Amino acid sequence: MKKKLLWLLLVVCVVIFPLTAKETKAETEGDWKYSYDSTGVSIDAYNGTDENVVVPEKLGGKDVVAISCYAFSQNETIKTVKLPLGVDYIGFSAFSGCNSLEEITIPSSVTVIQDNAFRNCTSLKTIEIPE
């Protein structure tokens, strides 16, 4: 009886777990490396050289909803960043070590800013959060 129950449990796990997994795909568009799933796009890296960066509202036709951990980390070039309305998450150390970053505009849609998101941003003077 115990063996049958264990086998049944194993079969249920094998069938159910793949159904609950979130499929994430990675892409590159211009200077942006990003991943996406059914909820939207997460910016994984900015590979450009602009000093004034405006994060696009959409990439690959999908809404940008998150800035991933370390996405801009250690970027010595950027001075200003503007995030689009719709972004609701800024990941751990997303902008850490951006020594030239002076100003960032964070939309009111952001509900989570993880630890160390702006650690060692020694030039950061202005954080604007429009209503």
Where are these regions (language model features)?
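Aromatic (phenylalanine/tyrosine) cluster motif
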Residues: 17, 89-92
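Sec-dependent signal peptide cleavage junction
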Residues: 17-30
